[in-house]
Amino acid sequence: MRRFWLALALVVGVSTSGPAGEVNLTVVNVVTPQDVKIWEPTSLFAKKGDSVMLKLINRHQDEHGYEVAAFGVKEVVEGGKSKDVKFTADKAGIFPIKCHLHPAHVVGQLVVLE
C-alpha cells in the first residue's frame, strides 16, 4: 500500500509540474521478506525533457547492477556504497529497469510522461 501512495504522489508531482526540470530520485537495493533482492521503488516517473538524478544506494555487501538501457544508464554499485547517476529523459514511454549483473533479482520501470 505504501508503494501505491508513493507512486501516486510521484505521478501527481510529475504530471502537475510545469516545463521539464530536474527530478531527484533515491533508489535503494533492499531484500524483501521473501529474501528477494530488489531496487525500490520499482516504478520511477519523470517528464520528457527532465534531467533525472538517481542516487543508487546498495545496502547489501554484494555489488549490484542498475540499467535503464533506453537512456544509456548501466552502472555497478559496490556493496555498502552509493552512486549518483544523471541522464536526460529525452523520450516518452515505459522503459524497463534491470540489474544487468543479476537479472532475476530486479524488475522495474521508468515511466516518462509526454
Describe each PLM feature range:
Residues V23-N24, V77-E114:
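Extracellular/periplasmic metallocenter environments
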Residues W5-S15:
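Bacterial N-terminal signal peptides
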Residues R59-K81, Q109:
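Histidine- and aromatic-enriched segments that form or immediately flank copper-ligand environments
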Residues L56-N58, L101:
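Non-cytosolic beta-sheet module surface loops
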Residues T16-A20:
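Sec/Tat signal peptide C-region and signal peptidase I cleavage site
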Residues G21-S51:
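N-terminal edge beta-strand
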Residues Q34-S43, V68-A70, G80, D84:
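N-terminal post-signal-peptidase region of extra-cytosolic proteins
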